[in-house]
Amino acid sequence: MKLDFVLNIDCLIGMQDIPAETIDMILCDLPYGITKNKWDLMIDPTKLWQQYERIIKPNGAILLFGQDKFTAKMMLSNEKLHRYNIIWDKVLKTGFLNAKRMPLREHEDIMVFYKSQPIYNPQMTKGLPSHSKGKAIGASIEEISSNRIYGSYKVVENKSDMKYPTSIWKFPKPHPSTAISSTEKPIELCRYAIRTYTNVGGVVLDNCCGSGSSLIAAKLENRHYIGMDNGFCDNKKSKYYGMSWADVATLRLDGVADWK
């Protein structure tokens, strides 16, 4: 299978050429269908899932960005595969024109879908040592406990200062003064997601890749990539204005050193 390329094509057509069960991760910022922009048209979820479910590996992860009603629609479009959501804290706030009518917006959703347990590499962070669990006098540290969900389990004290990640990922959104696209996602966020749900050498697909941030992230993390997009850069302040997103992504990828 050909790898490490970007196509200027409708993704519903382009994905038909990807062999079944060959993709380790789909990381995509689909159009939400919430603005009046010509490119912001929601892709038919039924047709999208037909391709996604065909090409993703049985233990592959599908991560889709979303917000508000679009998140709800996508979750309900495949309740069987939807597992949980991650909150992306964008740090930069938006929605100032409506600040007196509703809270400023500071987050987006990242929906996680999969068929069976995917690769999961928790990105540990250093923090304060874990405190001891309160115990009755004379009780063993390794006493047997139980709950309604997991049944019986053994309590083992852990004083490590390494912390597991939570469901909130904090990465600054690209500032409007430097962003190529209004919906551009930070490369570091994409790198974090790719490290979490794939191993080195895995294949990452972004079927609405825009300026290619997710593909750059894959290349930086020593993963293969496939990108698709049939739109063009409409940011008049960008040096890429008028270019197809496929060409923009390819140019940006050319500036990233090969890892092979």
Question: Model-found features: residue ranges?
Answer:
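Core catalytic lobe of class I
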Residues: K2-M228, F232-Y241, A246
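Short, conserved SAM-binding/catalytic segment
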Residues: M1, M243, D247-K260
